[in-house]
């Protein structure tokens, strides 16, 4: 008779033998999550309505014509170039809707928008074509750039849709040096579309969100939504707005500067693009205090020392001139209402990055490794304690926090059998910003 063997769930076997379980170590770890993802609603003259689409930095450089309707170097994409200087990816949403797609006898633009009016279809007789059996070469141009070529086509039904047009499969192909599509319109940007963006983006992960809207109602909408998402839903990110220091909240950053030559009526809020990207891409152990603006816009930095001090006290992120460079004066958010329960430390974006990193990482760790999987007993709570300690030690290793004492971290059973209560003490590190030096001359 063979000895018993196999795997076991409980130690209740009858036969003698070896019962061995082979299990993988848990894939979930306490490692730090990456930063560098933003979310941004924009007005476009090309693109699908009512949907979030994600673009990586590489895709933006290589495929901007296909995605946004303009080549990478176009003036219209200056803001997006600023945005992508410091991020890996961005979740976009087209704010304008209800536009018309350009069309001609042979094709209809893939997306609505006036950029569809630059589409041109050129058709010529293919080699071997005869009057009895015509064969065609069909070329698609977008803003003068050849973007598609299909050779030896017998009829329109044989054409394959491309990134720019959907073919009219019932069309009669005929020689044309260039037939333009027409009738494309951008549609309208409605206030409701901003809310649609916020609703759609809730299920995505990102580090910062922003808008260049100057409408106080829209800015208030973004600020209120950010506060709800952070405080009630538990999703940690920061929101960048233009001249909205009234938010008085650590989750909202207010950009103060306009561009050179802009009046109060013509302010573009263009610096929001760069700040959204820079804040999203800033590492958890870094600060943007004294960071150099590396974008394309000419920033108005005509502020006196008193105005700069007043801006800091009011919770405004402001750029100033340092020799020949434009730099961020201090990496702060709009929080200024200091209380015993919330100190001035919460006005530092570096501090908020650390706290957000902890909040997002530990939530992800718990939801992935523990939720519904690990018993809420002493062993399970010790495991969670170990993972949190490992996470915090990684933060301490990269000098994002200091003086971490594992013994002060507690993981206890909550009021119900399913609840776990964690009490955590962390001290975020901030970059040096002020030097107080006394020189004694002997």
PLM features per residue range, with description:
Residues 2-48, 52-60, 65-68, 72-375, ...:
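A glycine- and small-residue-enriched flexible loop/hinge signal that marks low-structured segments
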Residues 410-442:
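C-terminal edge-of-domain segments
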């Amino acid at each position: 008779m063979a000895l018993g063997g196999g795997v076991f769930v409980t130690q209740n076997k009858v036969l003698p033998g070896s019962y061995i379980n082979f299990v993988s170590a848990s894939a979930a770890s306490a490692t730090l999550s990456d930063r560098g993802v933003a979310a941004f609603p924009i007005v476009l003259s090309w693109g699908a309505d009512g949907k979030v689409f994600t673009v990586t930095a590489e895709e933006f450089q290589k495929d901007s014509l296909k995605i946004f309707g303009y080549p990478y170097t176009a003036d219209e994409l200056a803001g997006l170039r600023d945005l992508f200087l410091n991020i890996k990816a961005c979740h976009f949403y087209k704010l304008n809707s209800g536009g018309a797609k350009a069309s001609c006898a042979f094709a209809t633009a893939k997306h609505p928008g006036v950029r569809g009016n630059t589409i041109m279809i050129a058709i010529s007789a293919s080699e071997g074509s005869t009057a009895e059996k015509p064969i065609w070469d069909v070329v698609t141009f977008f803003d003068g750039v050849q973007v598609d070529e299909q050779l030896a086509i017998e009829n329109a039904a044989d054409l394959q849709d491309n990134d720019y047009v959907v073919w009219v499969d019932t069309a009669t192909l005929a020689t044309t040096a260039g037939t333009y599509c027409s009738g494309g319109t951008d549609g309208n940007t409605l206030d409701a579309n901003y809310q649609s963006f916020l609703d759609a983006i809730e299920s995505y992960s990102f580090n910062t969100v922003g808008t260049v809207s100057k409408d106080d109602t829209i800015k208030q909408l973004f600020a209120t939504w950010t506060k709800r998402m952070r405080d009630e839903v538990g999703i940690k990110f920061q929101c960048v707005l233009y001249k909205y220091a009234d938010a008085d909240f650590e989750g909202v950053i207010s950009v103060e500067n306009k561009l050179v030559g802009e009046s109060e009526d013509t302010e573009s809020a263009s610096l929001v693009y760069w700040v959204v990207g820079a804040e999203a891409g800033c590492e958890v152990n870094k600060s943007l205090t004294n960071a150099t603006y590396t974008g394309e816009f000419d920033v108005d930095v005509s502020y006196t020392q008193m105005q700069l001090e007043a801006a800091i006290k009011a919770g405004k992120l402001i750029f100033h001139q340092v020799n020949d460079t434009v730099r961020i004066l201090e990496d702060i958010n709009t929080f200024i209402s200091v209380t015993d329960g919330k100190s001035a430390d919460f006005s530092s974006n570096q501090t908020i990055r650390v706290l957000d990193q902890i909040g997002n990482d530990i939530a992800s760790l718990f939801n992935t490794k523990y939720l519904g999987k690990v018993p809420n007993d002493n062993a399970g709570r010790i495991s969670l304690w170990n993972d949190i300690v490992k996470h915090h030690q990684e933060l301490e290793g990269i000098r994002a926090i200091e003086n971490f004492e594992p013994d002060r971290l507690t993981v206890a059973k909550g009021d119900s059998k399913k609840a776990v209560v964690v009490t955590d003490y962390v001290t975020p590190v901030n970059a040096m910003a002020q030097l107080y030096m006394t020189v004694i001359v002997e």
